[in-house]
């Protein structure tokens, strides 16, 4: 960048955060009563509350606010996530689907929108991806901790008392029973089928077509466009422009969500939650 601007190595660059840039977007078109909200979803997806990633409770509340805010005429959902919890992704997707019933929802992929990050985009009217975005990864996996060998080497044993065969399917010391493995496998397979089902609905494809490119395969944005997993290759600005077109807006302002909170606000919020 310094070379392009004919600056010396020691010269400082004046920088602006992307959220500030978006907030000042297209000043000539600003109209306070017509707002396009850019909802940022960055990081892994988790259940519960938190501020350093995508937490389902926080995001569900944020989406509901956007749904009920009459000034917000359209939402651009900016996703930059490798995925995470299936349950949390489900909660977010459901709320996005409710939002879409009231106003246009356009998705814009950042550097990556994979697995759950792709899944939560399935409630959108249209998906924009950058050519080099890492996306797809339509798949599900589960992990069960097993310390049986470590326990054996250290002479640790456990003697479970149970009421039926399924009461102790998983033990950190004794491992997983065949029944437990079977149940876990069925759960993962069921979640995968649900994932593919939502993709088939949004992308207007058959189960077989999505399954063929699923199984956890990671794709570039360009490849995803070729096989119909995204609608257009484009930037965040392209998504905003389309959202304005979809909402029939000529004058509007753009606002970034969720609103940033300071470290002190996070601290006091956590204290309130602990009480």
Please tell me what each predicted stretch does.
Residues 1-130, 134, 141-275:
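N-terminal organellar transit peptides
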